[in-house]
């Protein structure tokens, strides 16, 4: 009788539903950034990156993003800039080949979902908050993410490049992920 009571109690307690795990569709996804150089805007993208995404808009506490970026895969369309960014003044890929972002939580600001997490870049860990737009699509979904980081917080752009009148202090991060359920 006692076993039956324990079983009934266990069944009566609602289980916390896990977020849906998604697989990134790389060919239809982008991870990019924009900044300014001498007042002119420029855009860039990373060609190699991975993302483990678990998301449930109704239960944000069960959601998680884990993104790793191969920094040497950066492309901006400008040869001089593309040659400089992996170097020691900027990403220093010889010492720090990857950047890593992992969420620590999610919250809502009105209708906007915000992913809070830690970004590790050049060996420096800083909190970063990103706006999230998740749209179910058929069996999968799209996930758009946007936010701003201060490059000097991570030591990106040293020496003459630390001057924010040459290279702007703020770098906008943007990503569009096409996701399929696992």
Residue locations for each model-derived region?
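Bacterial N-terminal signal peptides
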Residues: 5-15
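Low-complexity, acidic/polar, glycine-enriched regions of mature
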Residues: 18-182
């Amino acid at each position: 009788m006692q076993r039956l009571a324990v079983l009934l109690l266990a069944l009566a307690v609602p289980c916390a539903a896990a977020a849906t795990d998604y697989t990134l569709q790389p060919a239809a996804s982008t991870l990019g950034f924009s900044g300014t150089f001498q007042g002119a805007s420029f855009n860039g993208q990373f060609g190699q990156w991975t993302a483990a995404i678990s998301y449930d808009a109704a239960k944000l506490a069960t959601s998680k993003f884990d993104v790793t970026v191969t920094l040497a895969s950066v492309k901006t369309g400008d040869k001089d800039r593309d040659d400089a960014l992996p170097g020691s003044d900027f990403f220093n890929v010889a010492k720090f080949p990857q950047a890593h972002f992992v969420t620590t939580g999610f919250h809502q600001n009105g209708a906007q979902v915000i992913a809070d997490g830690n970004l590790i870049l050049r060996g420096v860990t800083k909190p970063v908050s990103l706006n999230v737009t998740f749209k179910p699509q058929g069996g999968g979904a799209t996930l758009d993410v946007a936010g701003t980081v201060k490059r000097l917080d991570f030591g990106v752009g040293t020496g003459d490049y630390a001057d924010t009148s040459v290279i702007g202090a703020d770098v906008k991060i943007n990503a569009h992920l096409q996701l399929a359920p696992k």
